[in-house]
């Protein structure tokens, strides 16, 4: 099966359409030999689709009308937003009530109880997060951030998410507020909804009649603000109607009105989700089912449905969804979760000083930190004084004299390649309490592990992450090709000792007694005199980028065998124990089901999952592995996809790295490193706010 089209616009979206529809898309030109399973596609009911539709009829082939879904984009398509849904209707199209559509058929089909429950959960998430068609709306300074509950949205008087001027204007009167929704003149959804421009006038008259003492608010269409398109009602002289043309989140406006009047706008559907009375003066897809006050009728829509049944059809079953990071089809809940990850509160600080960052780090630090402050300032040393709306951010344990600074470090699933070879991190941990590897003082991660309640859903997610990590064998750096390892046939216990970089901050601040690879090997040999000790040096040491070599005497006495370019994940199935000072490999080994002994105090020690030579006194809680994994990989770090600029989940990064495979552990040449540095210099100088810089209002 293949798809064919003559539309250049559709072909331009080939990379997103193909995974959503699950078949290749081709340009229909010249003599094409079609098979009986092929499908011709066009975009909605645009005039240029008539030819291809007639072609399909002449050939006896199916014809699908394509459209954006109702949760359409992360960002706005005019500003590089990412498409996340597609409708492919083989019957008609949802906005044309003059003929049947697949959506109409789905709405009329009874749902299983499980599907209705799923739809109810989805409604709750859409309302809680403010998910809409174009998810591109910023918060405003001084807005109130409510609890995030669904009920918070329906409280009239909570003006969070509205521009301050509009919020002030709306609070000037206690009268009922009725929202009239304008649309672009000539929009195909108007005649498709059995309506005309006269129905907009009738809508205003009905609102006046039904609510004689109310304030009538006319919401203009966003596309009319620049003057390139005109609205049906906005051009009329309506003395008793207040124009609302402010750029604001649709839900922020919907939550402060008492009813919604529309002809065929999607705002009416979103009004239903928010529990508002909706009056329809056309026949949009959500009208005619007993959920709206309708001025028109459609004979085909002769059953009453519940809101969950409407949502199940319109948002779960009808559109196809795309994970824009992985480029593969997904479910609506996954898209909602991706959108939710882009939600960031308004900046906490006016100015954030990033101290001592090299030029190549500045580009990726901007991406990870821009949501924290209105202004990022890269400086060589900390400022002497800070105002109440300023903060300092430093790398790791640098500037230990700073008490309240944010400390940043690589995440636990970092990249495909070494940081010392200038591979950008896909994950960072930004900690306002301390830093996770410094066991001398508390950290944000330690506080999460000590005190954060982990729900059953979160434990299940932790278990799923463990299974995913075991399946794909993803680690922090993902260097060294997976190779076969032949376990020594000497009958002895096989103990893997993982080396680190001598002088590493995690050793100096997190290992009170054992502080070098050589000391570690001597300690393990003393504890395990009969074991076969397998030693794996740190990749940076192998690459020649850092120090950490051991003496010949230690090598002869303490090490039975070494591995260099075999990844740790290839060794875990064969070893009986892993010993380390503070290496992340201990955490990775726990995930892979290996017994772990720590000689320092890494973040994963002290929770009852490891054997600890020096257990940390502050860590009194006992955690299941799934909770440790959830809090460490989900709750603590931030993840970015550099291709799309989106905040992502650890699951997405794991799958992405698994697709990419492993990189070489060899040191990059000086020329290669300079090429990378120059690229980052250019990016730093030319950088503009990335797609992830938009923020959604929390209600």
Where are these regions (language model features)?
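Catalytic-core helical/loop segments in enzymes performing group transfer/polymerization on anionic/lipid-linked
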Residues: 1-699
């Amino acid at each position: 099966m293949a798809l064919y089209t003559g539309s250049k616009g559709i072909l331009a979206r080939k990379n997103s359409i193909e995974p959503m529809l699950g078949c290749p898309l081709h340009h229909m030109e010249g003599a094409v030999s079609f098979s009986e399973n092929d499908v011709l596609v066009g975009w909605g009911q645009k005039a240029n689709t008539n030819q291809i539709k007639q072609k399909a009829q002449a050939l006896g082939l199916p014809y699908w009308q394509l459209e954006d879904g109702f949760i359409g984009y992360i960002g706005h398509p005019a500003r590089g937003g990412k498409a996340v849904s597609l409708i492919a209707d083989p019957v008609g199209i949802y906005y044309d009530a003059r003929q049947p559509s697949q959506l109409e058929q789905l709405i009329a089909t009874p749902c299983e109880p499980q599907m209705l429950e799923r739809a109810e959960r989805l409604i709750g998430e859409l309302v809680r997060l403010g998910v809409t068609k174009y998810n591109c709306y910023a918060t405003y300074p001084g807005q109130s951030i409510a609890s995030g509950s669904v009920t918070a949205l329906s409280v009239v008087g909570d003006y969070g998410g509205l521009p301050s001027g509009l919020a002030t204007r709306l609070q000037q009167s206690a009268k009922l507020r009725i929202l009239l929704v304008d649309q672009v003149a000539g929009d195909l959804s108007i005649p498709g909804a059995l309506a005309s421009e006269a129905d907009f006038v009738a809508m205003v008259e009905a609102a006046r009649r039904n609510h004689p003492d109310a304030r009538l608010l006319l919401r203009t269409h966003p596309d009319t603000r620049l003057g390139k398109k005109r609205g049906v009602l906005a051009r009329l002289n309506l003395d008793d109607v207040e124009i609302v043309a402010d750029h604001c989140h649709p839900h922020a406006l919907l939550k402060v009105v008492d009813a919604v009047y529309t002809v065929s706008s999607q705002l009416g559907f979103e009004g239903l989700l928010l529990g508002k009375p909706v009056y329809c003066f056309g026949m949009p897809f959500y009208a005619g089912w007993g959920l709206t006050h309708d001025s028109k009728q459609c004979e085909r829509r002769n059953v009453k449905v519940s809101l969950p049944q409407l949502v199940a059809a319109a948002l779960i079953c009808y559109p196809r969804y795309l994970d824009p990071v992985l480029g593969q089809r997904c479910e609506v809940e996954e898209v909602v979760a991706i959108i939710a990850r882009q939600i960031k509160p308004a900046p906490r600080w006016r100015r954030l000083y990033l101290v001592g960052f090299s030029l190549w780090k500045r580009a990726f630090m901007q991406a990870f930190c821009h949501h924290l402050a209105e202004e990022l300032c890269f400086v060589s040393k900390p400022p002497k004084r800070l105002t109440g709306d300023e903060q300092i951010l430093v790398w790791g344990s640098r500037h230990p004299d700073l008490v309240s600074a944010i400390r940043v470090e690589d995440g636990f699933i970092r990249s495909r390649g070494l940081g010392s070879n200038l591979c950008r991190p896909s994950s960072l941990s930004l900690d306002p309490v301390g830093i996770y590897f410094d066991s001398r003082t508390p950290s944000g991660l330690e506080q999460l592990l000590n005190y954060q309640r982990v729900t059953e859903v979160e434990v299940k997610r932790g278990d799923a992450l463990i299974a995913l990590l075991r399946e794909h064998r993803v680690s922090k750096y993902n260097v060294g090709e997976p190779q076969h390892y032949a376990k020594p046939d000497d009958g002895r216990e096989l103990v893997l000792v993982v080396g680190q970089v001598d002088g590493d901050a995690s050793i100096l601040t997190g290992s009170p007694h054992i502080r070098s690879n050589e000391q570690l090997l001597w300690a393990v040999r003393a504890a395990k005199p009969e074991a076969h000790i397998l030693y794996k040096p740190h990749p940076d040491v192998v690459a020649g980028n850092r120090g950490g070599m051991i003496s010949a005497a230690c090598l002869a006495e303490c090490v039975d065998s070494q591995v260099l370019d075999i990844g740790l994940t290839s060794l875990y199935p064969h070893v009986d124990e892993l010993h380390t000072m503070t290496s992340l490999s201990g955490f990775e080994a726990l995930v892979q089901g290996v017994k772990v002994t720590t000689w320092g105090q890494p973040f994963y020690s002290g929770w009852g999952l490891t054997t600890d030579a020096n257990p940390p006194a502050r860590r009194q809680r006992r955690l299941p592995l799934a909770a440790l994994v959830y809090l460490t990989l989900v709750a603590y770090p931030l993840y970015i996809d550099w291709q799309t600029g989106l905040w992502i989940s650890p699951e997405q990064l794991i799958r992405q790295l698994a697709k990419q495979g492993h990189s070489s552990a060899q040191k990059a040449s000086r020329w290669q490193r300079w090429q990378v540095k120059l690229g980052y210099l250019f990016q730093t100088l030319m950088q503009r706010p990335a797609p992830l810089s938009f923020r959604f209002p929390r209600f």
